[in-house]
From Swiss-Prot:
This is Polyribonucleotide nucleotidyltransferase. The lineage of its organism: Bacteria, Pseudomonadati, Pseudomonadota, Alphaproteobacteria, Caulobacterales. Its main location: cytoplasm. The keyword Transferase applies. It is found in: Cytoplasm.
Length: 716
């Protein structure tokens, strides 16, 4: 019944098995990939003809994690998988980015790649397995795909690179680097880095590219036996048409790209496009003309040719800058004074308002992943409204691009966050892109760094980011610093680099051609370093160190540690005690299993009251210490004072004042706040307190004053 073909690849001490012919046989390509006990099914299907009027390449990649893969049932009312999680969206993009440039130019048939995680051993991350499986499925499908690609993850532990580290090894790694590429070149890089040098990161990319060759060769060997007949697709030759269009509007295009302002430049380009359409496009007046979609496609190619050639020949870019010049920068902080922290970061025509909000443990995001449930205390949300580019468009829930850009900025900033023990806040950053002309994700990194410092977050060091571009032709190449939107669109690379004065924290690279060499990557990283340092210097003009304290409108949090055997007493039966503490003091109390207690409130008095209460449960009152107390009952022989959480003690009438007190009720009233010193305990264990040895204004211990030696008295 089945014609099963299987390829086993020994890969870095692990075994990757690619199998086809048993499952999903009606798909154009289907591969079941297994590493360890992680299993992913990848399928590839493509339409056999393009839709009429199709003017772009409609590739869709869906990475889906089934909860049964980890032996779990989905939470929620419906008990089935719903909208994609953040990880599913990010991995879908991770697979899409290296395969998209490898389809034959001009191919506009719809392609859908679906990667389904069927089993997860909680050791081998399915994202790399899915990437390799998707590559294999496309290669054997017969689609005009110039692959295969390979992909792998690289860690860095004890100054050594680790291929495809396990989830446990990744926790100890200073680098989480994902690389995809062909046999000849790197296509995609995604990473989170703990302030490592450019040389170490570049070494990791080279290590990854060498390591993935085993997978690429294995896929080729599988395809030799399992691949379908190649789909007959011949890209249309448009060279003659391009020459005619260039003759008609080439000068107009060249003139348009000498205009520095984005809006004016786009208006001139639109006029040139209209002229080309009027001259060549098929219409009622010109029935023998060219199909408008085909004409627009040729027009875009001509645009790219003119811009790229100009940059390579002159070294001058669209807006008049040289290849390594960064646009003018202005950073401002505290622009929204009632928020916890805010910044406005403007670089040329790209601008972001970034707002930092500090919260408590209750504000952490609960994440239910295949690997288990956990809470995330650092959140970054990126919003890209259509008005930021002068357009109308869809508003609503974030798209894949917004989720991806937000995660890139999150990765760049996370290595510089303070330890949870030092700063026990939940941090939420929101980046509102208000203008965009290239590199809005890196503007988010810079603005977020400033906003957190404005909020009093003790960052280890500020972080800056820059987007690099590339123009690559047979006769040379140019690496561009701080690219514009047009340069991103017309260029060959989008290379985003973020880091501090000490090293890199994040790297993301997408190649639109068949890969780049190590030499180009090395130059891009070196040029990016200079750009990052310049941007960091401009940011430091706005703020170069975090504020010493959080703002007035932020919650205050203090942390104490209690013995784990006292946790039950603080919580109480059914949570009775902790609810009483919260209701009485007005503070929030959060206790974890290790005995760490976080107490938060809008003001310090509430926090102190809650902490004192908790200490009264978990600690014994200290003889000789002075406490704030409240009179709870006045009797003939003295007053009972609540002084240490729920603990009460007696201030005998003789200990109320240094002057004679006939009736305690003459000087004390119930509810009165007093300062008392714990004298000790009587034979029956009753607590003895004194007011008269404490200055009721300052809280000073008067008995210590009385005990001054004669020599000290003389000196005084």
């Amino acid at each position: 019944m089945f014609e099963i073909m299987r390829k086993t690849i020994e890969w870095g001490g692990k075994t990757l098995v690619l199998e086809t012919g048993r499952i999903a046989r009606q798909a154009d390509g289907a591969v079941l990939a297994t590493m360890g006990e992680t299993v992913v099914l990848a399928t590839a299907v493509f339409a056999k003809k393009a839709k009429p009027g199709q003017d772009f390449f409609p590739l869709t990649v869906n990475y889906i994690e089934k909860t049964y893969a980890a032996g779990k049932i989905p939470g929620g009312f419906f008990k089935r998988e719903g909208r994609p999680s953040e990880k599913e969206t990010l991995v879908s993009r991770l697979i899409d980015r290296p395969i998209r440039p490898l389809f034959v130019k001009g191919f506009k048939n719809e392609v859908q790649v679906v990667c389904t995680v069927l089993q997860h051993d909680l050791e081998n991350d399915p994202d790399i397995v899915a990437m390799c499986a998707a590559s294999a499925a496309l290669v054997i499908s017969g689609a005009p795909f110039m692959g295969p690609i390979g992909g792998c993850r690289v860690g860095y532990v004890n100054d050594e690179y680790i291929l495809n580290p396990t989830l446990d090894e990744l926790k100890e790694s200073k680098m989480d680097l994902v690389v995809a590429g062909t046999a000849d070149a790197v296509m995609m890089v995604e990473s989170e880095i703990q302030e490592l040098s450019e040389e170490i990161v570049l070494g990791g990319v080279s290590f990854a590219h060498k390591s993935m060759q085993a997978v690429i060769n294995g896929i080729i060997e599988l395809a030799e036996h399992a691949a379908k007949e190649p789909f007959d697709f011949q890209p249309e030759d448009t060279d003659a048409l391009k020459a005619e269009v260039k003759k008609a509007v080439g000068a107009d295009l060249a003139d348009a790209y000498t205009i520095r302002a984005k809006g004016d430049r786009h208006a001139a380009l639109s006029a040139a496009k209209s002229k080309a359409v009027d001259t060549f496009a098929k219409s009622d007046a010109n029935p023998a003309g060219i199909d408008p979609l085909k004409l627009i496609s040729v027009f875009k190619e001509l645009e790219a040719d003119i811009v790229r050639r100009s940059i390579l020949d002159t070294g001058i870019r669209i807006d008049g800058r040289t290849v390594d010049t960064v646009r003018p920068i202005l950073g401002e902080v505290g622009i929204l004074p009632r928020t916890h922290g805010s910044a406005l970061f403007t670089r040329g025509e790209t601008q972001a308002i970034v707002v930092a909000t500090l919260g408590t443990g209750d504000d952490e995001q609960f994440i239910d992943a295949l690997e288990g449930t956990y809470k995330e205390a650092f959140l970054l949300h990126y919003n890209f409204p259509p008005f930021s580019v002068g357009e109308t468009g869809r508003m609503g829930s974030p798209g894949r691009r917004e989720i991806g850009h937000g995660k890139l900025a999150w990765r760049a900033l996370r290595p510089m966050l303070p330890a949870k023990e030092d700063f026990p806040y939940t941090i939420r950053l929101v980046s509102e892109i208000t203008e965009s002309n290239g590199s809005s994700s890196m503007a988010t990194v810079c603005g977020a760094s400033l906003a957190m410092m404005d909020a009093g977050v003790p960052l280890i060091r500020p972080v800056s980011g820059i987007a690099m571009g590339l123009i690559l032709e047979k006769d040379g190449f140019a690496v561009l610093s701080d690219i514009l939107g047009d340069e991103d669109h017309l260029g060959d690379m989008d290379f985003k680099v973020a880091g501090t004065s000490q090293g890199l924290t994040s790297l993301q690279m997408d190649i639109k051609i068949a890969g780049i060499t190590e030499e180009i990557m090395k130059q891009a990283l070196a040029q990016a370093k200079g750009g990052r340092e310049h941007i960091l210097g401009e940011m430091n003009k706005a703020m170069d160190a975090p504020r010493e304290e959080v703002g007035d409108y932020a919650p205050k949090i203090e942390t104490i540690t209690i013995p784990t055997d006292k946790i039950r007493e603080v919580i109480g039966t059914g949570g009775k005690v902790i609810r009483e503490i919260v209701a009485t003091t007005g503070a929030k109390v959060d206790i974890n299993d290790e005995g760490t207690v976080k107490v938060s409130a809008s003001d310090g008095a509430k926090i102190k009251a809650a902490i004192d209460w908790i200490k009264s449960i978990t600690q014994e009152a200290e003889v000789g210490a002075i406490y704030d107390g409240k009179v709870v009952k006045v009797v003939d022989f003295g007053a009972f004072v609540n002084f240490f959480g729920a603990k009460d003690g007696l201030v005998h009438v003789s200990q109320i004042s240094n002057e004679r007190v006939a009736k305690p009720s003459d000087v004390l009233k119930e509810g009165q706040i007093v300062k008392v010193k714990l004298l000790g305990f009587d034979d029956r264990g009753k607590t003895k307190l004194s007011m008269k040895v404490v200055d009721q204004e300052t809280g000073e211990d008067l008995s210590k004053k009385e005990a001054v030696s004669p020599e000290e008295a003389v000196n005084t």
